Curated annotation (Swiss-Prot):
Keywords: Antiport, Cell inner membrane, Cell membrane, Ion transport, Membrane, Sodium, Sodium transport, Transmembrane, Transmembrane helix, Transport
GO molecular function terms noted in the UniProt entry: sodium:proton antiporter activity
Pfam families: NhaB (PF06450)
Function: Na(+)/H(+) antiporter that extrudes sodium in exchange for external protons.
PANTHER family per UniProt: NA(+)_H(+) ANTIPORTER NHAB, TRANSPORTER ARSB-RELATED
Species per Swiss-Prot/TrEMBL record: Escherichia coli O6:H1 (strain CFT073 / ATCC 700928 / UPEC)
Gene name linked to the record: nhaB
Name of the protein in its database record: Na(+)/H(+) antiporter NhaB
Lineage, top ranks: Bacteria, Pseudomonadati, Pseudomonadota, Gammaproteobacteria, Enterobacterales
Length: 513
């Protein structure tokens, strides 16, 4: 018997999402206009909370759908305007270009990356050293690349590892649905579950590594560029200015990596199953034996393109997204990928997230129009100069964990610059505040996927359901890093930032403009 029209509409609405989730979203859509009529300020914060809820439930339904519906309603009822949303999108075009082109460009370097990381994984048997190497590699790369790019690299490697073993475990040689475990017997499932735990820990170490490295340089994160430009700093200036905070944080972060692996805390410590190692070793041996000269040329070309990528980003020869586009063009041209459909596959991972980020910019527009952060900013600027550093750091951290890092960093640096230009604070204090804003925006935000775009990208990637990495599990595994990075960063802002910066000036390494 065919279902009713109403039932059919209900089933189509948000597809396979649970009924309670669908009902919750409908309630949000009904309540928001009513609250907006009473108090636009409260309605604005309610919208932010609802959007965070959709992100937290990312595995129930991709946040683009419910978040998009909330954003459309927000524009429709007047919480913001379509023109303001367009302005926010235009202001963040660099980030969108990064997602569209840089992430896709990495897709065409997966052969080289899989080769390198397979050798790394097979040559380092100690899980502690392997975790440390992933964290250090991610930190180093994210000092020159955007964190999203680095996470995209590690995701592609992890999916490659998982796919190799999954095909063996399911006794299927051709490409299969990696989420389908129905053809795997109980013995293989136990090993597969251990392998998932192993990959989860590596992904989290790498993800935190991007935060450790990304905060150190002006090209590490999009907001770093904005802050560096506002302060008039170049690459070397930015690194030295941040180092009183970022260097101790990096050291403590790496020690935390070793500690959680050693003590098997917070879901870490899972080792690579020997059976999986054997499969990966066989795959590596087979790949090397079957590698033709044409394949070797591809690897060499990809390595050269990798050098170009790091060099172009370090010297900021062009916008990040345009450099990514050059990677796509060079990699496809020189490795023989000419089919439109083959090229199109590179964009399947990044474009949904690009659309999601665009939706988020509409929420940012609401935050600005409803002046949701104004009371916080006014409170901070009324404090003493010494207290301002810690308060800027703390409030940046709190807001960055629930909002867009680029937005939070931009708002605070603009407010600090306005205060400096009006004479409320000195130029020297402004430069110290710029460091507090940058570190406060980057470090505490590892607490949730909402704060780190790289974490959110990981959570909503094709890898997350494969390795059972949910929102809650990600927050739990990030907790030791959150505590260490946040507290060490705060202590450095409080006690070492001003004296070390003063010493740098006396040595002539940096100067106030």
């Amino acid at each position: 018997m065919e279902i009713s029209w109403g039932r059919a509409l209900w089933r189509n609405f948000l597809g396979q999402s649970p009924d309670w989730y669908k009902l919750a979203l409908i309630i949000f859509l009904i309540v928001n206009p009513l609250i907006f009529l009473i108090s636009p300020f409260v309605a604005g914060w309610l919208l932010v909370a609802e959007f965070i809820f959709t992100l937290a439930m990312a595995l129930k339904c991709y946040p683009l759908l419910p978040g998009g519906l909330l954003a459309i309603e927000a524009v429709f009822i007047g919480m913001t305007s379509a023109e303001h949303v367009r302005e926010e999108v235009a202001a963040n075009l660099e980030v969108l270009l990064l997602l569209m082109f840089m992430v896709a460009g990495i897709y065409f370097m997966k052969q080289l990356l899989l080769f390198i990381f397979t050798r790394l994984l097979l040559s380092i048997r100690s899980k502690m050293l392997l975790s440390l190497s992933f964290c250090v590699a991610a930190a180093f790369l994210s000092a020159f690349l955007d964190a999203l790019t680095v996470v995209a690299v590690v995701i592609s490697v992890a999916v490659g590892f998982y796919g190799i073993y999954h095909r063996v475990a399911s006794s299927r040689t051709e490409d299969t649905d990696l989420q389908d475990d129905s053809h795997i017997d109980k013995h293989y499932k136990v090993v597969l579950e251990q392998f998932r735990g192993f990959l989860r820990s590596l992904m989290m170490h790498a993800g935190v590594g991007t935060a450790l490295g990304g905060v150190m340089t002006m090209v590490g994160e999009p907001q770093n560029l904005i802050i560096a430009k506002a302060a008039g700093w170049h690459f070397g200036d930015f690194f030295l200015r941040m180092s009183p905070v970022t260097v101790p944080v990096l050291i403590c972060g790496l020690l935390t990596c070793l500690l959680v692996e050693k003590l098997r805390w917070f879901g870490y410590g899972e080792t690579l199953p020997e059976k999986v190692r054997e499969v990966l070793q066989q795959f590596d041996d087979q790949s090397r034996n079957q590698r033709t000269r044409q394949d070797k040329i591809r690897l060499i070309v990809q390595a050269i393109i990798g050098v170009w990528l790091v060099t172009a980003l370090a010297l900021h020869l062009a916008e990040v997204g345009l450099i990514g586009l050059s990677v796509i063009i060079l990699a496809t041209s020189l490795t023989g990928v000419t089919d439109e459909h083959a090229i199109g596959k590179a964009f399947t991972e990044s474009l949904p997230f690009t659309a999601l980020l665009t939706v988020f910019f509409s929420v940012v527009a609401v935050i600005i129009d409803q002046q949701l952060f104004s009371p916080i900013i006014q409170f901070v600027l009324q404090a003493s100069e010494h207290a301002q550093l810690s308060l800027f750091y703390i409030f940046n951290g709190l807001l960055s964990s629930i909002s867009d890092n680029v937005f939070v960093g931009t708002i605070y640096i603009n407010e600090a610059k306005a205060a400096m230009e009006s004479g409320a604070i000195t130029l020297k204090q402004y430069e110290l505040l710029a460091v507090a804003i940058n570190t406060g925006t980057n470090l505490p935000s590892v607490a949730t996927p909402n704060g780190q775009a790289a974490f959110l990208f990981l959570l909503t990637s094709a890898l997350a359901p494969l390795i059972r990495l949910s929102y809650g599990r990600m927050v739990w595994m990030a907790l030791p890093y959150t505590l260490v990075l946040t507290l060490v960063g705060l202590l450095c802002v409080e006690f070492t930032l001003a004296p070390v910066t003063e010493w740098f000036m006396q040595m002539g390494w940096i100067a106030t403009l």
